[in-house]
């Protein structure tokens, strides 16, 4: 039972939902609420009730039908919303996180079609500083998509079954633009090994045609010939992200490290964000009911540098409910660069700290 509770604690902030073992319908989700103290949000400190910072508020449906032999059909529909307002996180898509259908062979693998995230989220996010932790522990701007803000539309995904802990996959999102070659298409590859104490993952994504809020995220007002007004986006004709990470459990301690790299550009030029995340997850009492996460990160975007420290502690009240506290601090370097933890309004200077107390329930 204790091992199940520990697994649940980690899964509360992870990317995946356990697969159904037999025919049936699963309704699942997560709701999270807490109080944040923000040291500087646009020039002033503030206290606010925010939701979905431990893990996104969401609910979904997952179904599996046994077709006989080794074959099964499955589907997954998942919606993201804001608990404090009830609003959808996406104004244009109801099932914005997952909307897919597919066939699977338990011995070989699966084929999925629809709307779904890439392997940067599914294989890399479990190795990030945000698991266990808060969304503010992700890299500045989430350009590497560890937080699943961007999904592939019109996608076909092929993924192997798990063989002795190893699994791999490939995705292609069709641009559906006549006579325009690769316009708006998306491609991804991923591989992971998860067996015993060792977990290793690698992922790669290439997107032709994506907008990026470089002004809102980093304060950039002009990039490669594009003047970026407040609220306007940079139009990246090529957007590449890749990551490599690992974790290893040693008794009560699980150190982890993750490196990601993102390149965005157009016909004029390219710029990159380089990210390093490292930390250790601790089961301090050996009772599998408490988790502590200590981590740090360093990110560079052009001539801007962001250094970050993250502290997190949670206690499981049951298999589905936990209470937690978290502290995130970021310091920015670079001419005129301001700090901005992921998911919060930017600071007016080079430093920002967020302290949060909250609780989460999954179903």
Regions found by a protein language model. Name each.
Residues 16-21:
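Sec/Tat signal peptide C-region and signal peptidase I cleavage site
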Residues 350-363:
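Outer-membrane beta-barrel "beta-signal"
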Residues 33-39, 79-83, 117-119, 172-176, ...:
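Transmembrane beta-strands of outer-membrane beta-barrel pores
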């Amino acid at each position: 039972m204790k091992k199940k509770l520990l697994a649940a604690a980690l899964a509360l902030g992870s990317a995946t939902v356990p697969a159904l073992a037999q025919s049936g319908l699963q309704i699942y989700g997560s709701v999270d609420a807490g109080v944040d103290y923000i040291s500087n949000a646009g020039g002033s400190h503030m206290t606010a009730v925010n939701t979905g910072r431990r893990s996104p508020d969401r609910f979904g449906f997952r179904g599996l039908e046994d077709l006989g032999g080794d074959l099964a059909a499955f589907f997954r529909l998942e919606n993201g919303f804001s608990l404090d307002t009830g609003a959808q996180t996406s104004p244009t898509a109801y099932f914005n996180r997952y909307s897919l259908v597919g066939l699977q062979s338990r011995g070989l693998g699966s084929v999925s079609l629809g709307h779904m995230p890439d392997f940067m989220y599914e294989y890399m996010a479990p190795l990030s500083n945000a698991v266990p932790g808060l969304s503010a522990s992700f890299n500045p701007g989430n350009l590497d998509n560890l937080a699943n803000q961007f999904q592939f539309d019109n996608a076909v995904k092929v993924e192997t079954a798990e063989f002795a802990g190893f699994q791999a996959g490939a995705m292609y999102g069709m641009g559906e633009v006549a006579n325009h070659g690769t316009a708006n298409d998306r491609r991804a590859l991923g591989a992971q090994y998860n067996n015993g104490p060792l977990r290793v993952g690698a992922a790669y994504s290439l997107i032709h045609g994506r907008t990026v809020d470089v002004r809102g995220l980093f304060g950039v007002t002009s990039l490669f010939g594009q003047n970026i007004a407040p609220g306007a986006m940079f139009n990246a004709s090529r957007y590449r992200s890749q990551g490599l990470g690992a974790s290893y459990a040693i008794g009560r301690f699980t150190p982890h490290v993750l490196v990601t790299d993102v390149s965005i550009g157009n016909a004029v030029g390219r710029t990159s964000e380089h990210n390093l995340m490292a930390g250790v997850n601790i089961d301090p009492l050996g009772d599998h009911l408490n988790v502590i996460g200590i981590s740090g990160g360093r990110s560079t975007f052009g001539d801007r540098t962001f250094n970050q420290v993250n502290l997190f502690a949670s206690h499981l009240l049951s298999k589905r409910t936990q209470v937690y506290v978290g502290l995130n601090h970021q310091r920015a370097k670079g001419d005129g660069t301001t700090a901005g933890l992921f998911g919060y309004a930017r600071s007016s200077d080079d430093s920002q700290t967020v302290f949060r107390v909250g609780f989460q329930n999954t179903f």
